[in-house]
Amino acid sequence: MYRYLVAAVAAVALAALQLPTAALAQQPLIIKFSHVVSPDAPKGKAALFFKEVAEKYTNGKVKVEVYPNSSLYKDKEELEALQLGSVQLLAPSISKFGPLGVKEFDVFDLPFLMVDDARAHQMMASPMMADLNKRLEAKGVSPLAYWDNGAHVYTANKALLWPEDFRGLKMRIQGSKVLDAVARELGAIPQIMAFSELYQALQTGVVDGEDNVPSNILTQKFYEVQKHLTVSYHGRLTYALVTNKKFWDTLPADLREPLGRAVKETTDFFNATAEKDNADALERIKASGKIQFHNLDDAQKKAWVAKLMPVHKEMQSRFGKNFLDQIYKASGFIPPQS
């Protein structure tokens, strides 16, 4: 009897020891997705869409936690957090990759390079991106997709109709050498600043203006603290959906395949959402009556292009003429002849 009792106790103890392991195996994989914009912006909507489809396609084996509005990391902190493995998904603008040490991504900030949807999509689908992706992966960051968030417009506390209107203005930029050169060529004073700090900086006059896509200007309410908006379409905002390379490479196949499918569907969702939301945002901002709208006429547009083309020449020393020529060919951009 005693022998049977000991055996039973041992069996119960062994089962108890095995319970945490079994329970652990049932726990979903947590993926933290951090971003700096509103949940109502195209990127915010896409993050929530990804959460929905990723959890669905993995049958609950993955749980996606979305952190909007810089609630987990500010934009100048998040890439380092990704490299350290503290967060698994980000969608920063590709302007952030220059300071990371992949300067070639700054090329996409060249003025008037990708001003329309077709040209932008053509560029991001070109074979050139494979080489740039490898350079990013060497930093421990794996691009999963590129999201086109549309063309930039300017806001400021004075009307920006001609290049000389920028002279002396403090303009917020991202940390891109090209954007710095653009501001200086216009006679403005570039101010690198985190996205989360921009509203207050505009409100208090720390900076005089900024450029962004209409959906961000609407959802962050920049139009409430600026007097003028110029529909300039001088540049483009492209996001990269990126993950930690080691994290992605070590995912089991039964998770990587459905997550890859979720990425593709989310990319299609994002691009369609951004196009619609930016058009709607312009109308809503205009209807608010809180900011004065300006559309550039042909003469003004030509003056902007002529003023900013020297930035392309200046950046040949940074990127090399051959690389720039490849970018022009891939994007369909034809530099004006001087």
Stretches with model-predicted labels:
Residues 1-4:
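Positively charged n-region of N-terminal signal peptides that target proteins for export
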